[in-house]
């Protein structure tokens, strides 16, 4: 197993579709990598037009299954940098803004979503 910080340029015209796939649980249901990819994408950070997240992977080349199933559809210019641990990877990107805006609930029956 290897841990990577992933850097990828989102295809902006498909960003809402990716958000929908995350929200529906479609990505997390993919086996064997879905839960890890879902967690990474939900917590991804943005900087200078690129998304960054941490991914644990067993494939060679890295992210082969993830790219084939999800990433190549929604991102361009995908690169990886190996890190020693999950914690090290997230610490490197923690100060960047989140890729996704968070929900603000205003009542038990409604919420405001501040963009994707």
Residues of each region from the PLM?
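Conserved short beta-strand edge segments in small beta-sheet-based binding/regulatory domains
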Residues: 76-90
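Short S/T/G/P-rich N-terminal loop/turn motif that feeds into the first structured element of a domain
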Residues: 1-69, 89-116
């Amino acid at each position: 197993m290897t841990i990577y910080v992933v850097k990828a340029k989102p295809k902006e015209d498909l960003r809402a579709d990716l958000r929908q796939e995350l929200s529906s649980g479609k990505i997390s249901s993919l086996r064997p990598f879905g839960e890890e990819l879902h967690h990474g994408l939900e917590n991804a950070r943005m900087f200078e037009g690129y998304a960054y997240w941490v991914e644990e992977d067993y494939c060679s080349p890295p992210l082969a299954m993830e790219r084939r199933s999800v990433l190549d559809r929604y991102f361009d210019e995908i690169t990886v940098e190996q890190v020693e641990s999950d914690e090290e990877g997230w610490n490197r990107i923690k100060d960047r803004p989140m890729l996704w805006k968070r929900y603000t609930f205003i009542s038990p029956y409604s919420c405001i979503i501040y963009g994707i």
